[in-house]
Amino acid sequence: QGLTTVVNGNCGLSVAPAGEKFEKEIAGFLSSVTGDSKNRETEIMSTMSSYMSALQKEERSVNTGMLAGNGTIRAGVKGYASGKLSKEEVHQVWNVVEESLAAGALGISLGIAYAPEFEYDRDGLVEALQPLKGTDIPVTVHIRNEGDGILLALQEVISVAEELKIPLHVSHLKCIGKKNWGEMPVRVLKLFDQAAARGVKVDFDLYPYLTGSTQLVHLLPPQFQEGGTDAICARLADQSCRRKITKVLKQPSDIFENIVELAGFEMIYASTLHTEKFRSYAGQSIAKIAEQLEQDPYDTLYDILLAERCQVTMLDTIASEEDMLYFLKDSPRISIFFSWIN
């Protein structure tokens, strides 16, 4: 493919700087993305400087850069607890951001759709990113919602970049859900045009295919992801809590990215499964697995997450080829992105 450079740490999910207090929790949360670390000397690193030192010791065939994940930074300070940061915690975040940039991080990545970053509101993001104010240091972002609430999600991050006067890069732009195909991309690019006219530096990338990939636990509504893996598994083991989750997932939402409602279980595939019970179903859709198990697909989802302790990645067919081609024609702003390159 002619790749010369790999930039790690996207979507707020970087392996550094994790700090030391919540290192175990962060390692567990990221394990479905980072893979099995049993044969590695280390995986999650407390500081960006330690990551850079380890990187220099590796033989690499391509250039390598690193973004400091805002999700990892926040988790290193507060764990996966809900609520706003205290003043002391905000200052800790600032210190880690500054240390990471000084150590060689290219910028800061956000994953506002993921735990724990979905705890930030718009003003909380502005506060957390204060060390970048007025600089040319880029912020890349997996926006809060790529489905029904995509316009609100884009307005949120454009507003943050505009107030801080920093460059903004939107990661893997797409419009999820058939009801959002066709007209929505036109409205999305209009937002970019309006922001650029006001002097905001904003661009985006997309991958040239129709299937995305992320953690299967991301299907759960944000309020049911709070507290980290142990708390999530406790909820999934509770039948009354399962019913509450299902009730939310069956409704459209512009507050969170409800991929279950937007794509359907037929288009959501469990791509990595490790337990004896589910290993043979890897690569199959949740709907297909549920059919073979003769159970409701919602319960299949919860059973998989519980058995695998949320360490599952998924593939989800969510985009439109016509929309993809429309975005690709926006040559002044577009770059092509290939995800999950190992």
Briefly describe each language-model feature range.
Residues 17-22, 120-122, 151-154, 181-183, ...:
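Short secondary-structure transition/capping segments
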Residues 13-16, 113-117, 145-152, 175-179, ...:
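Active-site environment of divalent metal-dependent phosphoester hydrolases
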Residues 48, 125, 154, 185-189:
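Amphipathic alpha-helical segments in well-structured domains
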Residues 99-159:
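Divalent metal-binding pocket/active-site signature
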Residues 5-8, 109, 140-141, 169-171:
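Short hydrophobic alpha-helical runs that function as membrane-insertion/retention elements
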Residues 41-50:
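Core domains of carbohydrate- and sulfate-ester-processing enzymes
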Residues 1-37, 41-42:
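Metal-associated gating/positioning segment near the N- to mid-region
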Residues 51-55, 60-87, 93-114, 159-162, ...:
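Active-site neighborhoods of metal-dependent hydrolases
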